Amino acid sequence: MMKANHSLTVEFILIGFSDHTDLKTLLFLLFSAIYLVTIVGNLGLVALIYMEPRLHTPMYIFLGNLALMDSCCSCAITPKMLENFFSVDRRISLYECMVQFYFLCLAETADCFLLAAMAYDRYVAICNPLQYHTMMSKKLSIQMSIGTFIASNLHSLIHTGCLLRLNFCKSRRIDHFFCDILPLYKLSCTDPFINELMLYIFSMPIQVFTITTVLVSYSCILLTVFKMKSKDGRGKAFSTCASHFFSVSIFYICLLMYIGPSKNSNKDIPVGVFYTIVIPLLNPFIYSLRNKEVVNAVKKVMKTHSIFKNSSASIAH
C-alpha cells in the first residue's frame, strides 16, 4: 500500500537556473518584464480581434486562439519560475507538476494545430482566392478551432494520466525550470515504456501531420507566387505570408531542437526558455507590427477611447 501511494506524496525540486544565484535578481526582473509584456500583448490581441468586426475572419480567429494558447503557456511556466528565483527549497508538488505539464502540453499541441491551420488558410487565400469564402469560411474556422482544443485536451489528458501511473523514487531533482515529460521519465523507478509508447502513438502523428501540412501549404504557395507575372502580386503574397512563415519556422526549429536527443542537459534550458517564454512574447509583435489591418484596428480603438474620454470630460465640466 505504501509503495502504491508513493507517487501521490512526492515533491520535486526544480534546479533550473540554480547555478546563477548571483544573477537571480536580474533574471527575476527580466523574466517578470517578459511575462508582463507577453500577457498584455497576447490578451490585448485577443481583445482587439474580439472587438473589431473586420478582424472576424478565419486568419484572425486562428491568430486569436494562438495568442490565447501563448498566454496559457506563459502562465503555466513563468509564475513558478519567478517564485523559484527566491525560493529556498525550489519545491513543486506532484499535483502542481502535473497541472503545469498539462497546460504546457495543451498550449503547445494547440499551437501545432493552429499554425498548420493558418498555413492552410494562407494556401487557400493565395492559391485559390476565388474559392476562399467557400473553402475557408468563418464557420469552418470556428469548427477547426474547437476541434483543435478538443484534440489538444485529449492529448494532454492522455500524457498526464500516463505520468500519474509512474512511481518516482530515484531522485526528486528535475534538471529544468519546469515540469516536462522527458526529465520526469528519468526520475521514475517504474518502467516508462507505456508512456513512451503513447508518445509514439499520439505525439509523433500530430507532429508529422502538422509539419507536413505546413510544408505542403508553403510549397504550393511558393509555386503559385513564382508563377505570378505581377511584381506587386508577388510582393503582396510574400508580405501576407512572411509573418506566419517566420513564426512557424522559429517554433518548429526550437521544438525539434528541444525534443531532439542530447547528451548535454544544460542545452535544454536555453532552448526551453526560447520555446516556452520567448516565442509567446514575440508572436503578437510578429503578427501585428507589419499588419495594416491590426494596426488600423488599434488606431480605431485608441481613437474611440480618446473620443469617449473627451466626451466624459466635457460632461463632467
Swiss-Prot record:
Residue ranges crossing the lipid bilayer per the database entry: 29-49, 57-77, 94-114, 145-165, 199-219, 240-259, 269-289
Membrane association type: Multi-pass membrane protein
Compartments where located: Cell membrane
Positions in the Cytoplasmic compartment: 50-56, 115-144, 220-239, 290-317
Predominant location: membrane
InterPro entries in alphabetical order: GPCR_Rhodpsn, GPCR_Rhodpsn_7TM, Olfact_rcpt, Olfactory_GPCR
Pfam families in the record: 7tm_4
SS bond partners: C97-C189
Cellular component, GO annotation: membrane; plasma membrane
Membrane side Extracellular: residue ranges: 1-28, 78-93, 166-198, 260-268
Glycan-bearing residues: N5
A Gene Ontology biological process term: sensory perception of smell
Record's keyword terms, sorted: Cell membrane, Disulfide bond, G-protein coupled receptor, Glycoprotein, Membrane, Olfaction, Receptor, Sensory transduction, Transducer, Transmembrane, Transmembrane helix
Its job: Potential odorant receptor.
Family, as annotated: Belongs to the G-protein coupled receptor 1 family.
Protein name, entry field: Olfactory receptor 5K17
Native source species: Mus musculus
